[in-house]
Amino acid sequence: MHVRAESLEQCREFFCEAMLQDADRDLVQRLPHRPSLSKPSIRHAGWRCMIDCMPSAYDAAYQGTRGANSEDAAIDLLSNEAKLFPRDTLEDVFAAVAQGEARYGVVPIENTLAGSIHRCYDLLFEHDVKIVGETVRRIVFALIAPPDVALSAVRKALSHPVALAQCEQFFRKHPLIQAVPVYDTAGAVEHVIREGRGDSAAVATRRAAEVYGGVILAESIQDHSENYTRFLLVTPSKSPEAAKAPAEDYKTTIVFSVGNVPGALYQSLRPFAERRIDLAKIESRPLRGSPFEYLFYLDLIGCADAKPVSDALHELSVQAKSVRVLGSYPRHRG
């Protein structure tokens, strides 16, 4: 983010002052009258500054152990000073947020190679949370072993099944190395370093090697260099909203259901097409308790409170069986 230091400092002071005054709504009204804070990059910086200025009690839960990709995403979304708490499963992360044990949860929602994380979609629907941010991280895997272990001696490589699947070409080139699935990439590194076996390694990121003192035997072993994971920042639904950015810098995620009749999905999407609203992603998941009926998750560009998105959502609510806005949040710009 390339902004002048004085502009960023002005932005920080303005947003921190608003936080101290607990004046979120007033903040939204005042932003357009501050010309120096009108650019999207400054607005996004303001959102980050608000996070930085929150009391030190804020916590974030993520799935995995120290050195996991989700921990890196949490640092991106919050700050290096954030109090981060690892959880064993995605279910644990959502439960921690919903029950007030953590102010935020950081969860992966999709990967450019593996596709959508379906369980995360289900948990978004099942828990009373909302999305308030997103980030995208490039995923680069390495083969990591205890010190003094040679690549030629490795016979087992531990990692999350998705990570192993993204490194198939490496395992074809090294047929003596068996891929062993475990629950977490960084956790695999922690395990092999603790055990100290001369024939075991793990597939994870460079940062995991740094955290646990591992040695990198092979770098960039993923099949494709363009490997990215998108992460969401979730918080309890009743939490105050963060600072607003311009509508075009927002993404909105909704979930809706329709009747099983011809043209129902088409009619549901028509209000967005007629208003030229960009639909970034659509995902379907089974509606539990209703065999062969589905929930549709939709990512669209724009803010739910701003026209024309608000008009389209109103029209959708008339046609659909149910509609729920899961969150409007500053979208990742890369």
Regions found by a protein language model. Give the residues of each.
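Domain-level signature for soluble enzymes in the chorismate/prephenate branch of the shikimate pathway
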Residues: 1-7, 11-15, 24-334
